Amino acid sequence: MENKVKTVAVFSGYYLPFLGGIERYTDKMTADLVKRGYRVVIVTTNHGDLPIIDEDKGRKIYRLPTKNIVKQRYPIINKNREYNTLMKYVSDENIDFVICNTRFQLTTLEGLSFAKNHHLPSIVLDHGSSHFSVNNRFLDFFGAIYEHLLTARVKHYRPDFYAVSKRSVEWLKHFNIEAKGVIYNSVSESLGSDFAGTAYLEKSADDIFITYAGRIIKEKGIELLLEAFSMSQYSENVYLQIAGDGPELAHLKEKYQSKQINFLGKLNFEQTMSLMAQTDIFVYPSMYPEGLPTSILEAGLLSSAIIATDRGGTVEVIDSPELGIIMEENTQSLHESLDLLVKDKALREKLQQNIAKRIKEHFTWEKTVEKLDY
């Protein structure tokens, strides 16, 4: 008798073309589930003028309507007639298993409620490592209260909890949650070969590219990088490439004007990876409650030397000075780290080789997604 193809539903606050670490995590995880023979249904929010029902490489996508309030930072689902129709379609997909990304997004409550109503097993994948901060003590205080209240509602459904890093596992204990294990954020094993030799920008043989790729928000530490680069006064063959969009972009472009600093704006995945393939030093100076940053894994597999802060699971990847530099969260530390790698080519190349090898051996979806078999 032929085995029934199992269908997995993934509930996530955002999905592509919204470009962030969790969205790339969802994309790569579900792509590998499809390769392993699963049907995949993604239930997300409609953060723009996108089709409410879509298909992408074997994955069915349902985009729920949202209210217009802060929809680009925290989507609030609008439970109108369109919502009811879409959720009826999801019910008709004959789901076998539910995966919810993050405790903090309201789509997780939707997914867990759906699983309960349909008597389905469910898991929550946590991507955090501390309370979210907007650098305002008053707002952060109430934000932490909100997170505890929301987490209590999530726990009420009794899902199994997993995390994308060991540090995320430890953070869940803050909410009296014992995670079942770690499902590491990962990258495709073929990423290195897919983008080897590609280029997004013109680059001479003696040019050095220092790159940041991510959202342009204060919490990501982007201004630390701009300050550190500007104070270094490097020779004309050293360039800082800033890829990404966000509320701080216009202000930073105005403040940091230099022939050696390029603000590239929002790039698609292929453009970003082609830039990574040209990158000598990738910097991720985040002060954000990360899980395990996707861009560190991508840059590392594409053989960039990495400088990053000790946030989330970063130190589980860069767990030795032979693999990269873990900086302090200040301009001076980043300035010194940049100087070291710009001036020491041998060290830079050694770190590039070592981190690429480590990620290929331990942080690829081909290995990670096996933990989702059920």
Residue ranges and their predicted role:
Residues I296, A305-A308:
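Short hydrophobic beta-strand element within catalytic cores of glycosyltransferases
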Residues K266-L267, S274-T279:
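Short alpha-helical donor nucleotide-sugar binding micro-motif in glycosyltransferases
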Residues P121, S130-R153:
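Nucleotide-sugar donor phosphate/pyrophosphate-binding loop at the beta->alpha transition
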Residues Y162, V187, E202-K220, L226-S230, ...:
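Conserved donor-binding/catalytic core segment of Leloir-type glycosyltransferases
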Residues A250-E270:
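Nucleotide-activated donor-binding/catalytic signature segment of Leloir-type glycosyltransferases, i.e.
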Residues S320-Q332, L340-A346:
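Conserved acidic donor-binding segment of nucleotide-sugar-dependent glycosyltransferases
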Residues H148-G181, V187-L191, H251:
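A short, active-site helix/loop in glycosyltransferases that binds the activated sugar's phosphate group
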Residues A277-G291, S304:
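Acidic donor-binding loop of glycosyltransferase active sites
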